[in-house]
Amino acid sequence: MKQTLLFILLALVGIAPTMGQNALNAKADNIVGTYTGTKNDDRFKARITRQADDTYKAQVFWVENDRDEDGNKILDRKNPDKSLRNTPCDRIVLFSGLQYNKEDQCWDGTKIYDPHRGIRAKMKAWFTKDGRLCIKGTLFGICESVYWQRLP
């Protein structure tokens, strides 16, 4: 009885990562596109592109509230890389070097940048059943997920 229960439990653990996924996770280039998302009540649009080395990069190209109180473009002042602190908020690279993991049918292998906090976290991305792109960031064992909606 214990062996049967253990077998069922192990089988469920093996199936769990694929539950809720859809066909969009089956091909690496399905992630390429334009998305909209929200972070801390700030709406933005980002574009994911395939790079020459077969990895993927996401860059913001529009932010709803991109100006400060004085009308100046908001800059990436919290970036830990001092050379990037003058980057306008609508040009921030959120991640690069993202790789497709064919076995797990997801994208991983890089870090995502959170410009609100000025931190980079290990990331994993996949499409949910309803077609949204789920991006999960993990830092020191703490996880946070955001959902991006593909634009037509």
Give the residues covered by each predicted segment.
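N-terminal helix-cap/turn-to-beta initiation motif at the start of protein domains
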Residues: 21-34
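Short beta-strand-to-coil "C-cap" segments at the C-terminal boundary of structured domains/repeats
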Residues: 147-152
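Short, exposed beta-strand-loop hairpins at the edges of beta-sheets
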Residues: 116-117, 122-126, 132-146
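Sec-dependent N-terminal signal peptides
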Residues: 4-13
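Central antiparallel beta-sheet cores of small beta-barrel/beta-sandwich binding domains
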Residues: 32, 37-38, 43-114, 120-122
